[in-house]
Amino acid sequence: MMNHKTLTIILAAVLSLACCTGSNDIEAIQERAGKTAEAYYTHLINGNYADFVAGMDRADSIPADYREQMEANAAMFMKQQNDDHKGISSITLSKCKADTANHTAEAFLVIEYKDKVSEVVCVPMVERAGNWYMK
């Protein structure tokens, strides 16, 4: 039978391993959620409005006419960005913070406009069945 000291050492080693493994997992989750948000916004700036809308949470269950309105709103948004900033030159992921217990994340994207202005936007994300979607 193990003594108390041996059991404590084994427990500490197991907990240390669990903590280290968890940090790697959270980094991978944050990277995946953030890169997914970046990909959805890349669809937006490339004019692929249907793909952008498809990246929204539960987009597969909305009525077709509402989906068309959302795609039209995305197109209007891009027109406004073209009018205000001569368009968007790039979207890049700055950082992402995930809440693994709630299967949510916040992706911070840097939008670089063609008029040299930039801004950071927060894209709330939710994970469903292993896939990340915009809230």
Question: What do the predicted segments below correspond to?
Answer:
Residues 1-20:
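Sec-dependent bacterial lipoprotein signal peptides
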Residues 18-19, 95, 121:
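The N-terminal extracellular segments of secreted preproproteins, especially immediately downstream
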Residues 19-46:
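Short, low-complexity N-terminal intrinsically disordered segments enriched in polar/charged residues
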Residues 34-41, 49, 53, 71-74, ...:
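Extracytoplasmic/secreted envelope proteins and their assembly/folding machinery
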Residues 46-63:
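Short, well-ordered alpha-helical segments enriched in acidic and aromatic residues
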Residues 71-118:
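Surface-exposed, charged secondary-structure patches
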Residues 118-135:
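Short beta-strand edge/turn micro-motifs at domain boundaries
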